[in-house]
Amino acid sequence: MKMPRFTPLVVPTQRINENYIVALRCDLTYLWHTDQMTQIKTVSSCISRALDAAVVPGFSKIGYRVRQWIGNWQAISDFDLRGKTVVITGPTSGLGEQVARQLAATGANLVLVARNKEKCARVIDEIAPLCTGNKPVFIQAEMGDLESVRSACTAIQQQFTHLDVLIHNAGALLNTRQISPQGIEQTVASHVVGPFLMTTLLLPLLVGGRVVTVSSGGMYTSPLPIFDNGETLEMPANKYAGSKQYAIAKRAQVTLTEMWAAHEPQTEFVSMHPGWADTPGVQESIPGFRRITAPILRSASEGADTIAWLAAVQPLPGESGSFWSDREIRPTHKSPRTKKSDTKTARAALWKNISDYVDSFTQSI
């Protein structure tokens, strides 16, 4: 195929939409002197970054399908994970169920961590014919209950000596404030503290492995709390808003992923956001948003693709600690407000905040 010649792109200096202009400008001015393959890759990158800057098309099924087409993505089923053990939390519906289905065809040995035994049994029965590895193993746990997480980790440690991938997917957006058995706001408990404890306990089994955390594009709206002013990850009851609390927890997940990568170089850590996917969680928690965006929402399978890909791809095509969407590294901030909050002091306070929760629990055992 003969590629068209590209003339240098002249970008207006006015800041009509700075992010969009920067994304479009990318490296097009250099295409004149590059080879065909470089031209293809550069144009693909430009399109992807433009979609990302525009948000709505980038997060929707439009962005997914355009990127899949221009990237000529390898099917998840083409990866060979025979002999690899993958732990997935929250596998009974939505993204988690689709990740389990996609990875079943790779030959991976799946460990499904779920709170509902009956729902997990249904998933296991349905994906068993797809499995080319061992039949999936069920481990019961409520990720917002630290005692339940500890028991699940003990069960995993008793059955396995090594884990290749741990996928933190479990969680939900709660519209009313709920408290975990350990007295922690439930969104923070299930999305942040529970996964932090599980990672800590399973880390000896994850040497040479990878931890994948499923965040959300909603985290772009949230800065880190101002811990010096007495704020924590938990919103007080008189100011509680489910979507805002969810975004705070999702921001914490991404920041902690970067910090885990610095703390534990023997294990790879990545986080990602799936875009806007039509899952039971979206249908139940934010029905108004779904009604408006229904025509452009991704399927749960499309939203799950990058999760499964990050579990399967070797070597990791990026640094440990990186943040992904649609098989590409993405920025962790889109606004000066959230970037300004991301300081060394705030990060140290975040780590201490979560460590204190976990230490308080482990000392009480």
At which residue positions do the language-model features occur?
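Extreme N-terminal basic, low-complexity initiation segments
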Residues: 1-9
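C-terminal helical subdomain
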Residues: 45-49, 294-335, 345-352, 360
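N-terminal polybasic/positive-inside topogenic patches
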Residues: 9-13, 27
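Short glycine/proline- and charge-enriched loop/turn segments
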Residues: 229-238, 285-292, 331-334
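C-terminal amphipathic/interface module of NAD(P)-dependent oxidoreductases
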Residues: 35-40, 340-365
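Rossmann-fold NAD(P)H-dependent dehydrogenase/reductase core
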Residues: 40-282, 359-365
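Generic detector of N-terminal low-structure segments
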Residues: 8, 18-21
